[in-house]
């Protein structure tokens, strides 16, 4: 199992390894590579940007700091020392996680078991997927498309989940059920309309299967037109018009 988390303070990766795995192999490799050993077994091994770049300049920055939690079969990594410590504490049950956030739990509870999923808590999607990442012409086009669709209100959470049957579920959370009803038709239109800042239209890649509200959430189901490919990775960065705030 793998998970990736990102916030304005840093990013983290968490990997669960199988029972019986020899975690001494990992700590031994970290030692050999030049990481600074922590004072306790569950502490953070310190690498840093210079060490990681010297090992291999193509290595992701999220491997600069590593916590090896053998008793939980987990390895936690981050691009920031403080964030690695925080993520490791959460992984050990000593800090609040997204699971403690009612809005995140509510969104996840609306999904069947996915093959892969992305979750943006609170208003993080409003910046991470924002149209402000596009040029001014694309932003102007987006404003016009949103107005023609009927207007939208800001998100308070967003999830995208791909099922084993390759159906993409998009859950957009709002302040209340009234906002969800108001956003249902505009969000559905935007999800199959033009994709300013990305090129083409979303309907080039997806067919809208269904759209409905579920409490304070708008739930869209889309089926990719291609039988293979990495659908979520094409939507994990902005601009994404149907997630606009």
Question: Where in this protein do the model-derived segments appear?
Answer:
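Soluble, non-membrane globular domain cores that form compact, hydrophobic packing
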Residues: 1-10, 16-245
């Amino acid at each position: 199992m793998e998970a990736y988390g990102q916030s304005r303070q840093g990013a983290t990766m968490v990997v669960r390894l199988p029972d019986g795995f020899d975690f001494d192999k990992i700590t031994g490799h970290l030692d050999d590579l030049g990481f600074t050993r922590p004072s306790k077994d569950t502490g953070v091994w310190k690498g840093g940007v210079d060490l990681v770049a010297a090992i291999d300049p193509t290595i992701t920055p999220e491997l600069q700091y590593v916590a090896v939690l053998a008793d939980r079969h987990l390895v936690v990594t981050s691009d920031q020392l403080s964030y690695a410590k925080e993520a490791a504490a959460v992984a050990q049950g000593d800090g609040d996680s997204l699971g403690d956030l009612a809005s995140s739990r509510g969104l996840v509870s609306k999904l069947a078991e996915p093959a892969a999923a992305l979750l943006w808590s609170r208003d993080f999607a409003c910046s991470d997927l924002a149209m402000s990442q596009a040029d001014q012409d694309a932003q102007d086009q987006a404003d016009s498309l949103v107005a023609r669709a009927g207007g939208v209100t800001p998100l308070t959470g967003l999830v995208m989940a791909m099922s084993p049957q390759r159906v993409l579920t998009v859950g957009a959370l709002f302040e209340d059920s009234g906002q969800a009803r108001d956003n249902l038709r505009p969000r559905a239109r935007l999800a199959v309309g033009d994709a300013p800042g990305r090129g083409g239209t979303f309907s080039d890649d997806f067919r809208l299967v269904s759209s409905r509200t579920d409490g304070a959430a708008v739930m869209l189901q889309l089926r990719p037109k291609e039988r293979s490919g990495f659908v979520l990775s094409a939507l994990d960065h902005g601009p994404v018009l149907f997630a606009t705030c």
